[in-house]
């Protein structure tokens, strides 16, 4: 499409568009307004979770205390992925989105200490993209399988492999779990509805009901402006959110 052509040509505008699309690619929306809505509401949810507000919904799955670090690290991984592997755009695809699923998990698991975050960012980004790319062209494409299998299988390989490597690094210790928001403080019926939205984005959008709602609102705005913008130009966005 137009975005891929622009990325191949090295257009900064389309590279930025690709960056934002990566943030909601896990939900198959991959649209700028959807990503912006998700980001805004993700920060709102994190703030409400930290305050233990009854309106927090699912918060950000108990990670409000490190949410800013999670988000910044995720963004840096997407930028680093483009810098390292941008030459692969010419092949028609680059799996930068996969680092959203790996680097973010490492930050949640190992904590927000600067040295740990830097290690998670660098190793996670360097390893994830090549593994997913190799799976795509070595197995997925030859067998005619859906592209997303390369990402999901790649993540399933990268997370345990990197975790084993981290064991060799003395500073990559696992911190004691922090206290998260208590869902019993909320109205049970309201929390049930929030949990449905939270489950949709359990891995890619922080398990946050508010972030998911923000993503859907942004996606709808994008679809109204151009029905072929969200959902990879398939025109199936209404079916995707139903």
Listing of model-derived features with the role each one plays in the protein:
Residues 1-169, 186-242:
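Pore-lining transmembrane helices
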Residues 171-182:
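Short, Lys/Arg-enriched, Gly/Pro-containing loop segments at transmembrane-helix junctions
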């Amino acid at each position: 499409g137009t975005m891929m052509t622009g990325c191949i040509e090295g257009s900064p505008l389309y590279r930025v568009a690709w960056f934002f699309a990566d943030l909601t690619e896990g939900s198959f929306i991959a649209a700028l307004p959807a990503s912006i809505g998700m980001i805004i509401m993700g920060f709102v949810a994190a703030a409400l979770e930290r305050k233990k507000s009854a309106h927090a919904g699912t918060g950000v799955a108990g990670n409000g205390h490190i949410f800013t670090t999670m988000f910044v690290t995720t963004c840096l991984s997407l930028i680093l992925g483009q810098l390292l592997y941008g030459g692969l755009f010419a092949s028609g695809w680059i799996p930068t989105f996969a680092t959203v699923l790996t680097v973010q998990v490492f930050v949640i698991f190992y904590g927000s200490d600067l040295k740990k975050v830097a290690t998670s960012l660098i190793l996670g980004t360097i390893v994830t993209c090549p593994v997913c790319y190799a799976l795509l062209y070595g197995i997925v494409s030859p067998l005619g399988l859906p592209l997303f299998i390369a990402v999901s299988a790649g993540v399933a390989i990268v997370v345990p492999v990197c975790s084993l490597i981290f064991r060799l690094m003395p500073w990559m210790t696992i911190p004691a779990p922090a206290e998260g928001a208590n869902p019993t403080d909320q109205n049970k019926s309201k929390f049930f509805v929030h949990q449905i939205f939270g489950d949709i984005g359990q891995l890619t959008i922080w398990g946050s009901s508010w972030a998911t709602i923000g993503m859907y609102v942004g996606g709808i705005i994008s679809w109204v402006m151009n029905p072929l913008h969200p959902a990879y130009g398939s025109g199936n966005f209404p079916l995707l959110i139903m």
